[in-house]
A protein has these predicted regions:
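Short coil/turn linking the two alpha-helices of tandem helical-hairpin repeats
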Residues: 57-66, 108, 131-143
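Conserved, well-structured interaction surfaces
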Residues: 1-62, 78-91, 95-116
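Short, small-residue-rich loop/turn micro-motifs
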Residues: 21, 63, 69-73, 97, ...
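Internal, well-ordered domain-core segments that constitute the primary functional module
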Residues: 98, 127-133, 143-147, 153
Length: 160
């Protein structure tokens, strides 16, 4: 994986997020709890999941990276963003996953075939656990248990 590939995906997600509400489609679905939801809200949440996932892939390889947020830069635009710290990146990823959890679909979905290609609440929770465990690991935290940073304990409690 090279540096630019994840940012290309992040840019495409930002383009989708900036334009999805312009497209008029009123498709709804019924979630596992019987609530009626708008499909475009789930699509936005799934796109934000992908953005969080690709930021995590960048952070695993490079440590802190520039965070673009929702901004859509033009392809020929000169972008000079400061590199965010590792902690800022982890907080951004976790906040993205926390923000989308209520808009993602929950298992089981009515159509088993459709379930294979849907980012659901459980996937977001699993990624959040992985991010927090990675952040609390000795690779980035010399004393993961003794330091009291809460990362290890928070990740361990996520399964509840």
């Amino acid at each position: 994986m090279i540096w630019s590939d994840p940012y290309l995906v992040i840019r495409r997600v930002n383009i989708l997020l900036s334009g999805i509400d312009v497209v008029p489609f009123n498709t709804t679905y019924t979630d596992a709890l019987g609530n009626t939801r708008r499909l475009n809200e789930s699509m936005k949440a799934e796109a934000r999941f992908l953005r969080a996932y690709f930021y995590f892939e960048l952070v695993k390889r490079y440590g802190g990276v520039p965070i673009i947020g929702d901004k859509v830069y033009e392809l020929n635009e000169n972008i000079e963003l400061p590199r965010s710290t590792f902690e800022q990146c982890i907080k951004y990823i976790v906040s993205e996953l926390d923000d989308i959890k209520d808009d993602l679909r929950s298992l089981p979905l009515p159509d088993a075939a459709a379930s294979a290609h849907v980012v659901n609440t459980q996937a977001a929770q699993a990624l959040k656990i992985r991010v927090l465990l990675y952040a609390a690991s000795p690779l980035f935290n010399e004393k993961p248990i003794e330091s009291g940073n809460g990362g290890t304990a928070t990740a361990a409690r996520m399964h509840e």
